[in-house]
Amino acid sequence: MPTYKLIVGLGNLGKKYEKTRHNAGFMVLDRLASLFHLNFDKTNKLGDYLFIKEKAAILAKPATFMNNSGLFVKWLQDHFQIPLANIMIVHDEIAFDLGVIRLKMQGSANNHNGIKSVIRHLDTEQFNRLRFGIKSQNTSNILHEQVMSEFQNSELTKLEVAITKSVELLKRYIEGEELQRLMEYYHHG
């Protein structure tokens, strides 16, 4: 069995959540899958996953809802024997303005319940993340209301640019580019 890279987008299933800020991870993974001419289709009760065989990569979206995302990540890690260094979690980040993306190689959950679940199930903070900024000046200051709100029409251009940039970064990661180099390019470029 090849050593896979696992890229997991966090979000919540269902039409009700589809366009919310909290589903930024799903939005990025859907676009990344389409780049490789793939579509997510329920493959497991815990979530959906796809293989990019020629790149030894797995794309995944948990079906466990945000707060239990770690269940699926752990199942995938165990099932496909994926080293922690090859796990990349794509998630919304309320601390960053919409349009900002940042790689993080390890660390705390920063109050993100999906990341808390992944940390709990993997029993470590030692995994990679792509943090996708979703903060808006035009929505509620109440955290739950802000992350569960939909993107406004005035934000759609910024959203599109950020998704495109995220997909480009992840494609380069899948193709073997070093995380440090990607950090330097996308954090400053």
Curated annotation (Swiss-Prot):
One of its GO terms (cellular component) is cytoplasm. Its EC number is 3.1.1.29. The record marks 92 as: Stabilizes the basic form of H active site to accept a proton. Its main location: cytoplasm. Gene3D superfamilies: Peptidyl-tRNA hydrolase. The record marks 12 as: Discriminates between blocked and unblocked aminoacyl-tRNA. It catalyses: an N-acyl-L-alpha-aminoacyl-tRNA + H2O = an N-acyl-L-amino acid + a tRNA + H(+). The keyword Cytoplasm applies. InterPro entries: Pept_tRNA_hydro, Pept_tRNA_hydro_CS, Pept_tRNA_hydro_sf. Keywords: Cytoplasm, Hydrolase, RNA-binding, tRNA-binding. It is found in: Cytoplasm. Pfam families: Pept_tRNA_hydro. It comes from the Bacteria. Monomer. This is Peptidyl-tRNA hydrolase.
